[in-house]
Amino acid sequence: MAKVLFSSFQQTGISGSLKSGQLSGVFINGTNLKSNAHAKRFRKNSTSSITIRCCASNSPTLENTKLAGAPEKRQKKKQLPYQGILHVPGDRVEELDTRETSLLVAEVKGWLMKLASGKGEISPSAYDTAWVARIASESDSSLPEFPEALEWIINSQLPDGSWGDDRHLQLYDRVLSTLSCLVTLKTWDIGHNSIAQGTKFLRENMIKLKQDDGDLLSGFEVTFPMMLHEAKQLGLDIPYETEFTRLLEISTKKKLAKIPLDKLHSAPTTLLYSLEGLQDLEIDWQKILKLQSKDGSFLSSPSSTACVYLKTKDRKSLQYLQNAMEDQNYAVPCHYPIDLFESLWVVDTIERLGIDVFFRDEIKAVLDYVYSFWTNEGIGWGSTCLVNDIDDTAMAFRILRMHGYNVSPDAFNQFWLPGDKFCCFVGELSHGVSEMLNLHRASQVDFPNEAILTKTFKYSHDYLLNVDSAHMDKWATKKNLMGEVAFELANPFHDCLPRIYNNAYIKHYGMDDLWIAKTIYRLPLVNNKVFLELANRYAQQCQLYQPAELTKLVNWWHSSRFEDIPSTRLTANIDMLPYIYYVICATFHEQEFAQLRVFFSKACCLNTLFDDLMDCATSIEELDRLQNVIERWDISLSHELPLEYRIPFQEFYNTVLVMTEAASKIHKNLSPEFICKYLSGIYTKLIKSEIADARWKIEGYIPSFEEYMENAEVSISTWVHVLMSILFCGEPLTEEILNTIYDSRPLKLDRIICRLCNDIQTYKIEMKLGQPTQGVSCYMKEHPGATEEDALVYLQSLLEKTKRELNESYFITHENDLPKNIKRFNFEMVRMMLITYNETRQVDLFRNPDNELKDMIKFCLETYRTL
């Protein structure tokens, strides 16, 4: 039914103070946004609400239409229980400086083009730079090969005597980095003052180290003990015997004992990343060279590669280190390169913040680069990395699939271990929350018959549901990772609208997030102030046009005189207008889709109202008369209809004329006559299907499930909003496209999904309201002995299957495919429906709104000022 989508948003609380006549304005805390839309700024954090107000005047009549016999105005309705709940921020947005936005966009475009060429930015690692600085010159062993690295070490010591990230004190990182720098300085016998300050820091802080609380650095159990051993040999005055070091020694011995040397020498594993910590093992360093990446590194680790060079004097290893030093301004990071990881996370961040509208071409270039390294076994963090991981593979799989690249979920098979467990790397002992979150997100873009993604979804979902809120992630220190997890679990991919998702992530996004490897590091192109400022600016920009568009819709409602319809069960009223409007704003938010938003909102109102009327129908004779008028599509026959049918038909008719005029200006290749026939045909098809529904109800007829679905797929009406709105979605259209689009596979899947999710959630309520014809009852009639639960299981399985088919239809480009924005609108129409009838909701949101849905709509209205 038409109301299934829009009615739920009717409950979110924007109040309407309405009288018949000319619209006076849309008010926030008494300020008229119609006359003062962008000039006023309200107090920040004030609790303002929207009121729609009209001044008294004679009600305008419909053009070319005279409504005879209209009843007197009804008494003002008492306020509905859901009114007055939703508030918009008191801090009104002003016109934005587009020059500043343009500068931000230009800066980010520069970053993306750098990533597309394999370049990026990562913070230097004192630990790794110190390892590289140990290397002696080939021509004179008394001199360093990289004197600039030694100079950087001395100049980068922090005021407290330590080395490491200067904006965040992570004790393990500071101690390890400081120890590495001291060993290097002591080896070259330089920087005595720096050594003194560094040893003082270690003496004061090593005793503060505690047993692993889940925040140890990657490989710390092997790298730190080895550094202690070397420091002791050099005579550094630091505490070697502490409770922590004793416990760590026990843990390290156990870990080293489990390492199979044959595997270490024969196949690339994560052990290659920390070879400098494995020097006590009987390693054949010449065999290790066979596991070298093509760039000369060992798993893109400068410190591990430096260790191998010190053992072997391998020229390829040295060349890698020389390249890294030159490229990174003589202070190497803990990963080099990290190009695939960085590129994927930059694109993901841009899309989650909702600013990808500025960077379509640049994102395509970055993803082309990433895709060139995709394999059937997944992907690693760098283009030369020989070990793939589930985190990068999941992120790459999801983003590449959503952008139409051909990627196979078989890449996840290698991460599935005996005992029904997934791992990030082979040999991993514990999970990180962030990797499971990315796996969970990737699992939701599945196609039919992809069993491995069913496994990944269940595994990651169960893990995230049960993870301790105090759990420390292995791979990142983020602003609010558990907040991200909670939001993702509550808002599955198909059940969340774009701007709701974007605005939520604006709250969770951290400009100063840290990443964890052998040391902590930063990715300035992933976490920065520019992204957040641009995201906030765009969120505000999306609000600038809203008052004028909503005002236009309110004026239209009053000119249509819907409130004159005499029906005691009519739930459609002007209060639903803001909710319908903000739903489409949360989806097609771009400024160029202004006409689409307005006409979509009108279509939703009309369909909701007419669906209500069909639910109330009791006369076969009146239905026959209505069908005759609809099929002939003749406004002169509207006087034959009772008032409750006459008013909406006249508005259907007038809306088609208005839309025809607007669409004709856009699609000059299409005649107005063709467009008018196209639009009237849509409404004719819809209304005839709703008449059939009403006829079945009056006659008490329960059809077979197949017969029911054939009509119910039409009466659900969501396809109507798609077919009408595509005229304004910015795509060139032809008569052939418009004549065949209804029968296209995406539209067919849309109709099935929307009907099924409606029936699954509302069948009990509709039975109580005397509407026995719905999917559950038809299935039970066709399968004698089947219970309601049996019917629901069948409908739910059919729904999930069809959602996977919709994913495939949307993300994969097919021959003779629909234009991109049409596919997008169709997909988002389904998401609008699914967010309304989420499987966790067991009520009819048309009559019983819930706080969760209200909160979601608040996201559409909020402007975040976090800078």
Curated annotation (Swiss-Prot):
Keywords: Chloroplast, Isomerase, Lyase, Magnesium, Metal-binding, Plastid, Transit peptide. One of its GO terms (molecular function) is miltiradiene synthase activity. One of its GO terms (biological process) is 5alpha,9alpha,10beta-labda-8(20),13-dien-15-yl diphosphate biosynthetic process. The keyword Transit peptide applies. Residues 1-55 form a transit peptide. Mg(2+) 3 binds at residues 758, 762, 766. Its EC number is 5.5.1.12, 4.2.3.131. It is found in: Plastid, Chloroplast. Substrate binds at residues 255, 474. The keyword Lyase applies. It holds the Pfam family Terpene_synth_C. It catalyses: (+)-copalyl diphosphate = miltiradiene + diphosphate; (2E,6E,10E)-geranylgeranyl diphosphate = (+)-copalyl diphosphate. Its main location: plastid. GO terms for cellular component: chloroplast. A motif (DDXXD motif) lies at residues 611-615. PANTHER family: ENT-COPALYL DIPHOSPHATE SYNTHASE, CHLOROPLASTIC. Belongs to the terpene synthase family. Bifunctional diterpene cyclase that catalyzes the successive two-step type-B (protonation-initiated cyclization) and type-A (ionization-initiated cyclization) reactions of geranylgeranyl diphosphate (GGDP) producing successively (+)-copalyl diphosphate and miltiradiene. This is Bifunctional diterpene synthase, chloroplastic. It comes from Selaginella moellendorffii (Spikemoss).
